[in-house]
Amino acid sequence: MNTTETSRAAAPLVLILGLGETGVAAARWYARQGSPLRVTDSRAQPGGLAALQAALADATVEYRLGCGEQFPPDLLDGVAQIVLSPGLVPHESPTRELLEQARERNVEVVGEIELFARALAGLAESREYRPRVLAITGTNGKTTVTALTRQLIEAGGMSARAAGNISPAALAALMDALDQDDLPQVWVLELSSFQLETTRTLAPDAAVVLNVTQDHLDWHGDMQAYAQAKARILKPARLAIVNRDDPLAVAMVESLQALNVRSFGRDVPALVGDMGLELGQGVAWLTACESNDFDEPAPAPRRKKDAPPPTRAGGRMSRLMPVDALRIRGVHNALNALAAMQLARSLDLGWGPMLRTLRDYAGEPHRAELVRSIGDVDYINDSKGTNVGATVAALEGLGQQVVLIAGGQGKGQDFSPLVPVVRRHARAVVLIGVDGAAIGKVLEPTGVPCAAAADMREAVRRAAELAQPGDAVLLSPACASFDMFRNYPHRGEVFAAEVRELALDRGEVA
């Protein structure tokens, strides 16, 4: 037996539970380490299987595919560790029973982000590679903040890679960087609540919780568990950043030392390091609270045992740029910009390059994305608005009357937070999907007209009839898409195609 075979035989058996993007990345990572693998999925032909089999041709892999609704009784035999896919709900069968067996057998359960954290720890020892790590979580805005933060960092002269929930998987990005001998100075990680549930040792240099509203309660069970999952990233972070407009986010940092906390919000910032918005002479500004001392402040003296904890001082407000100079639309995106700048500033980057990049940033697809204007009506694709909080933010942020297209799979959400914002900002609502009628029922007290549509074509045409010059037709469904579409990008693409078709029918091109 050669050396490689010996090391593989001695390595503990790892079970990859679920062959989504993170499961594939974890399998590839462990194969690089010479670990024997057992791979299972409820599907007989999960996506990417052929590519994975080709990549792991020389690895020791046992495939258990097509398990359906019940895992084989011997699935855990010989297993030392389980890598759990974030797509599997831990309190639902058959995953619940398997995880209970794992606990009884003292089998460790981890996620791909935990493996990434351990990989960085290993690289620190073997190659003295110690990158900065920034982490972003929250119900809405994660992808925008992650992508923008990476661009701000690169504008400031540091190399950065974005990974995690934004795709690619963190381990896939790390393997690519290793293979190209191009390890970045900074990792910018978008982390979902699912991923944080199985992450224990990641200690970011800075982490932000953007907001916490109802979502994924089918996965977490209740709002408290969902918020706790988000909060996991703040305590180990050297710098914790929260949205001070969000009571649940603010509560997460109450026990943390004030000097290690920063915030952003819709109001004027009062404490050094905080950021916010200011309305002056009819112009809204992105602002920062900076120290009154132009020299670098002296380090804080060692605190005596019974002394009160240190607090952050007030400072002077600096106007950075007008909100109207941003290409991304809405107050919620102005807040996303503040969060991204705070993360980048944690790396001691200057304002100038960041502000130039921020001015040119056009946003991410399907997130308050202007498709085009037809007859002085804006058509906006916010298909990524898959929960009530996202739709509330979009309605509040646009600053114009809206004909809202909403509906789909509601995921057991409470739709009542839509009532006050629809009453204030919506001229009409067009409802689609299996839970469209449920949304309409909740919105009855608003008095806002609601119309049902059988498909996206009818929804766009009906919304166009209801809109008036100066309005926006906003696709922000507050629901998942799987009842009518492959996913939320497909939903957004169909919306955009129908808008373009409407423009052609009305004789408007480009």
Swiss-Prot record:
It is found in: Cytoplasm. Belongs to the MurCDEF family. One of its GO terms (cellular component) is cytoplasm. SUPFAM superfamilies: MurCD N-terminal domain (SSF51984), MurD-like peptide ligases, catalytic domain (SSF53623), MurD-like peptide ligases, peptide-binding domain (SSF53244). Its EC number is 6.3.2.9. InterPro entries: Folylpolyglutamate_synth_CS, Mur-like_cat_sf, Mur_ligase_C, Mur_ligase_C_dom_sf, Mur_ligase_cen, MurD. The gene is murD. PANTHER family: UDP-N-ACETYLMURAMOYLALANINE--D-GLUTAMATE LIGASE. ATP binds at G138, T139, N140, G141, K142, T143, T144. Residues 294-316 are annotated as: Disordered. It comes from Bordetella pertussis (strain Tohama I / ATCC BAA-589 / NCTC 13251). GO terms for biological process: cell division; cell wall organization; peptidoglycan biosynthetic process; regulation of cell shape. It comes from the Bacteria. GO terms for molecular function: ATP binding; tetrahydrofolylpolyglutamate synthase activity; UDP-N-acetylmuramoylalanine-D-glutamate ligase activity. It holds the Pfam family Mur_ligase_C. Pathway: Cell wall biogenesis; peptidoglycan biosynthesis. Keywords: ATP-binding, Cell cycle, Cell division, Cell shape, Cell wall biogenesis/degradation, Cytoplasm, Ligase, Nucleotide-binding, Peptidoglycan synthesis. This is UDP-N-acetylmuramoylalanine--D-glutamate ligase. It catalyses: UDP-N-acetyl-alpha-D-muramoyl-L-alanine + D-glutamate + ATP = UDP-N-acetyl-alpha-D-muramoyl-L-alanyl-D-glutamate + ADP + phosphate + H(+). Cell wall formation. Catalyzes the addition of glutamate to the nucleotide precursor UDP-N-acetylmuramoyl-L-alanine (UMA).
